[in-house]
């Protein structure tokens, strides 16, 4: 409920329940407030009321693959938004050098590989319980046959074996581990792993200001990025707002500038999304 009203949300719930009971009174429909098959939703926004059915039955923003988690793991929806904000195209070469639990690379693989996030959740959809006269097995089979898992060039690197393992396991649960290359790689070795100007997009969630060696890490990160990133490539970072100026300072040292910037919220935490490009020298 959004807006100022002279009633409470519980009042709306009561009225909605009364309406449903009256509506289905003579239709041989069992109404059970605890053991239910169909969830009805009521949204009151200022002077308007929207009444509908929950077709999903579960939170569509949740990612079932997120089992092995880094303490500072990104939400899947935010990671996906970061990938799209970067300008990443499906056939491009993408690198996440601070992969943590792999969420950015996994979301990029979903997009680039044309693989549905909810592929393994089909049996959980609430609309399967609705009597719509639809053969849902045939419905999903028709969609599944279109899935090709297009070959991708996505690299998920971290300097700790633990998080490389986390990334690989989460990707396997997601069903797209074959679309990502996983490896334990130190920042200093990126110019050995990749040829000069061979990467289209670097997309990552770098270490925060709690790290004592942050200056050294960012300096090395932008130094390596300047070598492996194509001239028209981009670096897309998500960080705490308090770290953004520090990041920009090190980016400037290696001739990168901010081409666009946005603020996003993860719960009550404000995060900064910055997209960097190379300066024309």
Where is each model-derived feature located?
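A short acidic, Gly/Pro-enriched loop at the edge of an enzyme's catalytic core
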Residues: 188-203
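Conserved S-adenosyl-L-methionine
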Residues: 74-188
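SAM-dependent methyltransferase catalytic-core segment centered on the flexible catalytic loop
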Residues: 115, 119-139, 201-202, 207-234
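Conserved Class I SAM-dependent methyltransferase catalytic core
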Residues: 157, 163-165, 212-278
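Flexible, glycine-/basic-rich loop-and-beta segments that form/coincide
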Residues: 58-63, 67-68, 270-272, 277-281
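Non-catalytic, mostly N-terminal accessory regions of nucleic-acid modification and defense proteins
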Residues: 1-76, 83
């Amino acid at each position: 409920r959004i807006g100022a009203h002279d009633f409470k949300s519980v009042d709306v719930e009561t009225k909605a329940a009364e309406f449903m009971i009256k509506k289905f009174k003579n239709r041989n429909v069992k109404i059970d407030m605890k053991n239910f098959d169909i969830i009805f939703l009521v949204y009151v926004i200022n002077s308007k009321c929207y009444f509908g059915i929950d077709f999903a039955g579960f939170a569509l923003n949740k990612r079932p693959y997120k089992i092995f988690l880094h303490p500072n793991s990104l939400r899947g929806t935010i990671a996906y938004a970061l990938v799209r904000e970067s300008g990443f195209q499906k056939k491009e070469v993408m690198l996440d050098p601070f992969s943590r639990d792999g969420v950015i690379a996994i979301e990029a693989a979903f997009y680039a590989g044309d693989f549905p996030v909810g592929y393994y959740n089909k049996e959980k959809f609430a609309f399967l319980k609705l009597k719509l006269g639809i053969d849902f097995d045939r419905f999903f089979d028709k969609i599944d046959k279109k899935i090709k898992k297009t070959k991708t060039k996505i690299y998920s690197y971290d300097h700790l074996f633990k998080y490389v393992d986390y990334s690989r396991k989460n990707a396997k649960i997601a069903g797209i581990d074959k679309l990502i290359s996983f490896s334990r790689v130190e920042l200093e070795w990126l110019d050995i792993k990749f040829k000069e100007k061979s990467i289209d997009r670097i997309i990552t969630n770098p270490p925060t200001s709690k790290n004592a060696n942050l200056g050294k890490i960012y300096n090395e990160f932008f130094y390596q990025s300047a070598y492996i990133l194509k001239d028209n490539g981009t670096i897309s970072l998500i960080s705490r707002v308090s770290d953004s100026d520090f990041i920009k300072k090190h980016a400037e040292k290696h001739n990168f500038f901010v081409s666009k910037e946005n603020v996003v919220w993860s719960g009550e935490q404000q995060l900064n999304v910055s997209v960097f490009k190379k300066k024309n020298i």
